[in-house]
Amino acid sequence: MKKDTLLLIILILFCIVHVYGIYVHIYGINVSLENVSQYLYNTTVYLSYENGTPCFYIGEKKEFVIIPPYIKVDRDIAPLIKKLRFKIENKSYNLIITKKNVNTNKMAIIFTSINGSREVNGNKTIIWIKDPLKLKQSEVEALYELPEKGEVIARYKDGKPAAIKINNKIYVGFKPDEDVLANLIYIHIVKKTSNPLPYILFTVFLTLASLMLTFQETLKKKFLELISALASVKVFILSRINLLDEEKVLLNDTRREIYNYILDNPGCHLRELSKNLNKPVSTLTWHLRILEKANLIKSKKFGNRLIYYPADMDMRDLPLLYLKNETQKSIFEYLLKSPAHLRKIAKDLNLNVETVRYNLKKLENLGIVKSKEEGNRIVYYINESILKFHK
């Protein structure tokens, strides 16, 4: 009897170990099962069309096919996605876009179109339109001068921008009847599940069945292969962040409004949020803390202010996003190269001395620029604490 009890305890312990391994692997915790070598997150996903239907797959040999490609989208771009014959279902999948590679033999994902470009003072000015297919009506969204550091992501063969990153968003150029440029955007699909319990119970069943049948090396090896395969298929359920927690955090209307504002205005500070969202500082502080704990946003001391930005944003973009004034941006970029005195800055940037003086004072008040006396001149330089954003 004692022997049977001991055996049962051993079986339960084996089961718990295997279940825990699957569980942590599913939720992207930095622990992996033994013998698992294929991961489906942080991997290039390819797009092809089979019988007119878009199909995502992992790897050039299509080892892992993800179908049907349900995509969660905003209302503004839903008509564009439907034009490409994608199915839209908010309950099934998220589509995460970042700056990497995607290979496709047809036009892939459209977010916002580049209507055209022209030469202006040696810089290319991009005119953005929100509705390139004229499903409602086209409108100019913004004018943006290039080049800017890290903004152009890809170009078409004719040299025109194919994809551009601005304010932490990626805008893809729309070119009807032409193949989209390879190496455009990086996509990975994260499948959501409302409850991991069925997978855990299924794993418990497999573990018990396998261990009860035999402890022979051959069957143990097959069992591990099965668990590994199961883990590698399920690993894209949640990648790094528990999307269920993220969903719960953003179910709150106020929190979602704050989060969306930060997405659109990275580098904003508390008083700006309070003014533009018409909410008290105490309320904002509470919700901002929750968003940070959920790893949806981050905060950083920038000059004299604490600023907020999306968690996945490149910190090197923050200073230029924070400085809304183009003159201040020019002065900031100039001083990044080397310290200088007032008249040299004005001369090299072809700006009025008083204009430069006024904006330098603003930058000093923000704690972004500092000054020191060198001989009979005052030299301006970037605050050391700001320089870490550009390392």
Swiss-Prot record:
Keywords: DNA-binding, Transcription, Transcription regulation. PANTHER family: HTH ARSR-TYPE DOMAIN-CONTAINING PROTEIN, TRANSCRIPTIONAL REGULATOR, TRMB. This is Uncharacterized HTH-type transcriptional regulator MJ1398. The keyword Transferase does not apply. Residues 235-330 form the HTH arsR-type domain. The keyword 4Fe-4S does not apply. The lineage of its organism: Archaea, Methanobacteriati, Methanobacteriota, Methanomada group, Methanococci. InterPro entries: ArsR-like_HTH, HTH_ArsR_DNA-bd_dom, WH-like_DNA-bd_sf, WH_DNA-bd_sf. One of its GO terms (molecular function) is DNA-binding transcription factor activity. Transmembrane segments: none annotated. Disulfide bonds: none annotated. Gene3D superfamilies: Winged helix-like DNA-binding domain superfamily/Winged helix DNA-binding domain. Pfam families: HTH_24, HTH_5. SMART domains: HTH_ARSR.
